[in-house]
Amino acid sequence: STHCISSAASDVYKRQGTAGSASDAPKDAVFTIALRLPAWAGGETASDAVTVRGRDDISRVIRDGYLYLTGAWHDGDVVDFDFPMPVHMVAANPLVREDAGKVAFVRGPLAYCAEGVDNGANLHLLHADTARIASDPSCVSVDSIVFHAGAAAQDEQGLGEVDAVDMPMTTLTIPAWREVEDAAQTSALYHDWRPAERKTTTATLIPYFAWANRGENEMTVFLRG
């Protein structure tokens, strides 16, 4: 027979790692629910983050990246998810030349990016303070905001126009530094090398799916370290 499982995961799952699924099975309907244990949460080590509310008689088997829950399910039984969502710094394969020496940021199932509207122009001069982040991951701030999308058209055909939309979103604020633009250096194509002057700052990162919704500006996923 077929049994219905409803999910209350929605957008909160992507932002907070929490969700719930409810069963409408009649009393003592015995079947198995297979739940994927995502790699971003630790894979099979994340099975303890999945619980059946008020039930300790449901068997649990972990196999091939899934948690199998088997038992006599009742109408209204709820399976809760509470996956950890730490921020990870990610490096590309070293043979990907464009991203050599750079780092990207991932939290839960979402990759993040930097846009010029938040961080200023010339994003290639913006560096993530990887040493500080690696030594103290708590220095990365995870913030819940209301993201304001919307952009005016760039021509009479409506190119680039984005309707005004507000939606809840999670951003990351990371320690960073910028290379100071020296007029003597930027006025010529070449100049004598000297160490870059650093200006301490922070970088604001938004979920990758949200970029290009606030007018024309730069975007990068990988930041120099």
What kind of feature is each model-predicted range?
Residues 1-16:
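Single conserved hydrophobic/aromatic residue that forms the stacking wall/gate
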Residues 10, 22-26, 45, 62, ...:
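C-terminal beta-rich recognition modules with glycine/proline-rich loops and embedded aromatic residues
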Residues 14-17, 21-23, 35-37:
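Aromatic/hydrophobic beta-strand junction motif of beta-rich domains
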Residues 31, 65-67, 101:
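Residue-level marker for the onset of beta-strands and adjacent loop->beta junctions
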Residues 49-60, 108:
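Short strand-turn-strand beta-turns centered on an Asx-Gly dipeptide
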